[in-house]
Amino acid sequence: VLDGTELPQYKGDVKTMSGYYTDPVNGSKSFTFSGAEVDVQGTSSQYYARKNYKIKFKGGFVDPSGNTQETYKLRPDSVPTNTFTFKADVASSEGANNVELARLYEDTCPFRTAPQKQDSRIRQGIDGFPIVVFWYDGENTSFIGKYNFNFDKATPEVFGFAEGDESWEIL
């Protein structure tokens, strides 16, 4: 649940929000948060009615025991980070299959990057899992949609980026 008076409407329209994530399978993975910077993610997809949200959890993650962590692990074998994307996958019908295909590739690809040879948790492809997102505006709670809770593509620690590396997006 994203908690704030309004959601970001376009890339660069950053909102500071609080909220919570409830893991329906493993309650210990649930968390609350405050002071998160929420922005629209995606250059072309920012114009869709259903937005992708890049979230920088600046205030950390408060676990069910009340402990605050600066980073969060999507899975037990993941690299912890504090920036994630809630991806709507509006333009494609694959939805969570995008993530599952990337996981299959990750598991079967015989080629490893130099960072992966040093740390097997480093990824070449995206990872995440399906969630539903709601927005609480201070008065009402609205269903936003089915999303994927993904690593953000610009998290250097997840993908093994190093100082001087460049990442290009061709449109």
Place the predicted regions along the sequence by residue:
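Phosphate/dinucleotide-binding and metal-coordinating scaffold of catalytic cores
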Residues: 1-171
